[in-house]
Design a protein with these regions (language model features):
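Residue-level detector of alpha-helical recognition elements and their boundaries
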Residues: 24, 46-47, 73, 220, ...
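A small/polar active-site loop signature that marks catalytic segments
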Residues: 133, 142-288
Length: 377
């Protein structure tokens, strides 16, 4: 455990905070910090259509939250809609007679393309909907959630939905849909749609602890910096970036960006210092991360937490990124004490009995609530 005064950076309490431990999803704070350090969180990912003779190419750019129908400009999921893209494509082709048999539709998902699944991820976790293949294109409705796994090939599922949208918009499409070879000529740009701001996507990934969304967001952001699109390289880049921000990364390494790999080892100190850095108002992009973390008993992965009489004081006050794997539980975030001090705190329990996950969560919630109740000054 480590507790820090957010305003001064002074360590108020620390116990075994320099021992490397499996972080589970608290690692997402490190990933978000690395993304925010070099990425414009107000930017967007653009899904495009290009034309080359009789071929229309759907060019992926990292938006895995597409709507099958029309987009909703006020939403993060479904912000950009394939129906809108199809209608814009139809408008661009209105003076062009379709080729005999229809337009050939192909998918280009070569940008930031890499392994879909990390070597250490359990197949059972994929089938259970705890994660999904990491792609650069996907439907919001096809996101993996516990008990509801995604389709085998989310990018092609989205492309098939786009084909249907084209047909609805009056554009005949030939079968089959194909994938464009890497570095193939993409043709002339004719239509596009933009995702929600990257910061909003990152906020959603952390709020719901979405492993695949975190991985795809990180992979696409890191590709802009020339980082190879693998899980291991993403982990290395996160640690390298944190070190460049002045954080002590000794004995820490990440095997992926989401925290799902059990071989990742980081110190509580590193997680807490990254959380404290994000709480510093001089780092506005990083502050965006903390401002939108789940709130105890209200939102995200904390919506059903702090439910006991002993933890009611923490409700609505504690913010945290949660971390949960079998035998592992964690919280890292911010809270305000009864004396009005903003604290950052990080707690990791990595030796809990596998059958006591609920008890572990309750214990973590109790510790955070105790910090709220104290007069730390």
């Amino acid at each position: 455990i480590m507790v820090t005064d957010a305003a001064t950076g002074k360590t108020l309490y620390s116990a075994r905070s320099t021992t490397p431990r499996t972080p589970a999803s608290t690692a997402k704070i490190l990933t978000a910090t690395a993304i925010a350090a070099h990425t414009d969180l107000a930017g967007h990912r653009t899904t495009r259509v290009t034309r080359n003779k009789n071929t229309l190419t759907l060019v992926a750019d990292g938006d895995t939250l597409l709507a099958r129908g029309h987009g909703n400009p006020y939403a993060t999921q479904g912000h950009a809609g394939l129906a809108d893209l199809a209608e814009r494509t139809a408008k661009a082709l209105k003076n062009t007679p379709p080729p005999p048999g229809g337009w050939q539709l192909t998918l280009d998902d070569s940008t930031a393309s890499g392994p879909a699944l990390a070597p250490e991820w359990e197949t059972a976790d994929v089938h259970a909907g705890l994660t999904a293949p990491v792609t650069m294109l996907g439907l919001a409705e096809d996101r993996a959630t516990p008990g509801h796994p995604t389709t085998h090939d989310p990018a092609m599922t989205a492309t098939t939905a786009f084909r249907d949208a084209l047909i609805t918009a009056g554009i005949p499409v030939a079968e089959p849909i194909t994938r464009t070879p890497k570095n193939a000529h993409k043709g002339k740009h004719i239509a596009s749609i933009a995702s929600a701001p990257i910061g909003d996507v990152l906020t959603l990934a952390l709020a719901e602890s979405d492993n695949a969304l975190t991985e795809s967001t990180a992979r696409r952001a890191f590709a802009d910096r020339g980082i190879p699109a693998t899980f291991a390289e993403a982990g290395k880049h996160i640690i390298t970036t944190l070190k460049s921000l002045g954080l002590d990364t000794t004995h820490s390494h990440l095997a992926d960006a989401s925290g799902l790999s059990r071989s990742s080892r980081v110190t509580v100190r590193l997680i807490n210092k990254a959380t404290t850095l994000a709480a510093n108002k001089n780092h506005k992009q990083l502050t965006h991360i903390l401002d939108n973390l789940p709130v105890a008993a209200l939102t995200g992965t904390l919506h059903d937490r702090f439910a006991t009489p002993q933890t009611t004081t923490g409700r609505g006050i504690v913010r945290a990124k949660t971390g949960t794997l079998t035998g592992i539980g964690g919280l890292t975030g911010t809270l305000v004490t009864n004396s009005g001090r903003l604290l950052t705190y990080t707690i990791l329990a990595d030796q809990a009995p596998p059958t006591t996950s609920l008890e572990t969560r309750a214990a973590l919630d109790y510790v955070a609530t105790t910090l709220v109740s104290c007069g730390c000054n």
